[in-house]
Regions:
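ABC transporter nucleotide-binding domains
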Residues: 1-129
């Protein structure tokens, strides 16, 4: 059997439900199971409104799942709070769908890339050049 490597990020039965008008529930994600392997790339595609961004927001801890687990290096990160949650963000980040609204056009690309690295003490300001 081919060994595809270490699982770095995994979702187990992750669901996200939102309250809707009339006492209804909008199901954005329902029992999502996926594995991301260290050093590999995974593309997530689907129709507009199918829940891709909602899933990504949960993976980077901007939203909490209604149910299920999100495991990073085997540890459940879906319920992290406060400083633990902030520190975990140094390992999982994303560029949103419209990078032109996510990035400051007055900043150099180098500065955009280095900013989160400096925020988490991964590099010193003097090292960004």
């Amino acid at each position: 059997m081919y060994d595809i490597g270490e699982v770095i990020l995994e979702t187990k039965n992750v669901s996200k439900h939102f309250p809707a008008s009339g006492g209804r529930t909008l199901i954005a994600n329902n029992d999502i199971n996926l594995k991301l392997y260290k050093g590999k790339t995974l593309g997530l595609v689907g129709e507009s409104g199918c829940g891709k961004s909602t899933l990504m927001r949960m993976l980077i801890s901007l939203d909490e799942p209604t149910s299920g687990q999100i495991l990073f290096k085997g540890e459940d990160i879906s319920k992290l709070k406060g400083e633990e949650k902030r520190l975990n963000r140094q390992y999982i980040q994303m560029v949103f769908q419209d990078p032109t609204s996510s990035f400051n056009p007055k900043m150099k690309i180098r500065d955009i890339i280095c900013e989160p690295l400096m925020n988490f003490g991964r590099i010193k300001p003097s090292e960004k050049d």
